[in-house]
């Protein structure tokens, strides 16, 4: 049995917010980028990998997480996910089984801005 065949709505226990970058002009006329919430959805959240490495005289960390949610056509790789106080960069978006029923998003914790 494929993993997406066994998926059911009861597995979607975590609230995840989908963020979109917007650009406004501040009072001095300079562009200001900010992330605004587009939607909040229920999702299954599964940590899948993590590692630490030494770069630029500091310890860096990578934490990858799999988010599975109901299919949405409006999610793009230039968006972010917010879950449990952390923002995640979208690394991959997969339509599980190609049936537009479940969406799997691979995300990586953003450690700087």
What are these regions (language model features)?
Residues 20-21:
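Short acidic, Pro/Gly- and aromatic-enriched capping/linker segments at domain boundaries
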Residues 1-4, 9-10, 25, 30-113:
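Short, conserved turn/kink motifs that form compact alpha/beta structural patches or helix kinks used as
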Residues 10-16:
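Short structural boundary motif marking the start of a folded domain
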């Amino acid at each position: 049995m494929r993993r997406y065949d066994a998926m059911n709505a009861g597995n979607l226990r975590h609230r995840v917010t989908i963020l979109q970058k917007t650009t406004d002009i501040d009072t001095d006329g300079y562009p200001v980028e900010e992330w605004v919430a587009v939607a909040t959805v229920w999702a299954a959240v599964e940590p899948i990998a993590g590692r630490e490495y030494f770069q630029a005289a500091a310890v860096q960390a990578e934490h990858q997480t799999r988010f599975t949610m109901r299919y949405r056509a409006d999610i793009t790789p230039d968006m972010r996910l917010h879950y449990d106080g952390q923002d995640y960069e979208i690394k991959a978006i997969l339509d599980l089984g190609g049936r537009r029923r479940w969406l799997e998003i691979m995300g990586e914790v953003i450690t700087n801005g």
